[in-house]
Curated annotation (Swiss-Prot):
Matches recorded under InterPro entries: Beta_Casp (IPR022712), MBL (IPR050698), Metallo-B-lactamas (IPR001279), RibonucZ/Hydroxyglut_hydro (IPR036866), RMMBL (IPR011108)
Family: Belongs to the metallo-beta-lactamase superfamily. RNA-metabolizing metallo-beta-lactamase-like family.
Origin species: Methanocaldococcus jannaschii (strain ATCC 43067 / DSM 2661 / JAL-1 / JCM 10045 / NBRC 100440) (Methanococcus jannaschii)
Cofactors demanded by this protein: Zn(2+)
Protein name: Probable RNase MJ4
Amino acid sequence: MEIIFRGAALEVGRSCIEIKTDKSKILLDCGVKLGKEIEYPILDNSIRDVDKVFISHAHLDHSGALPVLFHRKMDVPVITTELSKKLIKVLLKDMVKIAETENKKIPYNNHDVKEAIRHTIPLNYNDKKYYKDFSYELFSAGHIPGSASILLNYQNNKTILYTGDVKLRDTRLTKGADLSYTKDDIDILIIESTYGNSIHPDRKAVELSFIEKIKEILFRGGVALIPVFAVDRAQEILLILNDYNIDAPIYLDGMAVEVTKLMLNYKHMLNESSQLEKALKNVKIIEKSEDRIKAIENLSKNGGIVVTTAGMLDGGPILYYLKLFMHNPKNALLLTGYQVRDSNGRHLIETGKIFIGKDEIKPNLEVCMYNFSCHAGMDELHEIIKKVNPELLIIQHGEEVQATILRNWALEHGFDAITPKLGEKIRI
């Protein structure tokens, strides 16, 4: 057996791992790394005979390179949950649309997206299937609705658990991960390490701090701009704003609108579905340019809240709103998600400047950060590792510092742990 790390090795983004035996070849995820330039996994000609692709969840860093396979005329089934399939379709179509609008080249088109979705076979959680020399089963990963950890049981008596992105604790939107796979012996655990060196602050305390800041902005007549990931963070923020009964107009813009409506068709996968329905009814939805113009008029006069994409400021309506509102210190930008290295959001944090188009600008509004992560914190990662108790621990999907700290902890606790480099191959 050989495991090849085609992406997300000592980095966050472009998740893609190949597992190859004498009888089968699969990919675990096929994502992109978003930033000023889009980076792709190593997808050379050796992947042409892949038997199956498993997608852990819809986020583009796990699904965004999937159409590349179909652009190359590959005929390969894709396995994921039904909700992930629907979300992936929305996100991939949007990626093509943005590329066309911004005149950026990406290595696939709308036809390739359609082919990727046509080849996608939905699979329920806890429904074991068999193929060639292995069985496979999906377990709820607790990261976002529809996310899955993937259990692979090979005939050579090697069992592999790929966590994907995972979270043990409940959030308002999603219930924590199902770890029932720990009842079986697992030889190899492939685990994320986004927060391999830090414990998340108390969620309730973060919410209260966030709400207090919004009230402060509204009291001074300002606009609170809240950039969000369309999948998960947008809905989590809507649930929080709804729960605290914020008395101000809340505008929901960008792809978050379509995604929220889609999620409400899968209420069994949501933690607070009735509250999300209520939250959506209480916001002003921006569906066309006239809505946006009217919203900007009202915001300029009276202040208010804008919840919109993109969460890392690399595109989407947030840049339009920033261009208009970033020169007034009464206004504020409230970052609610992880800012990947080389993203516009990370650039703002590190330099105090932001790119809008080709212009690098120093905004004159307040910038705040809040940890509403849907990833496991360091303590949760430790808990998973201890419960699984693998013979080999493979740490990926984390920047070098985070991955290395998690590896060192694992080594100190008696685990055989590695942090593979991009392109590295290991034999089992």
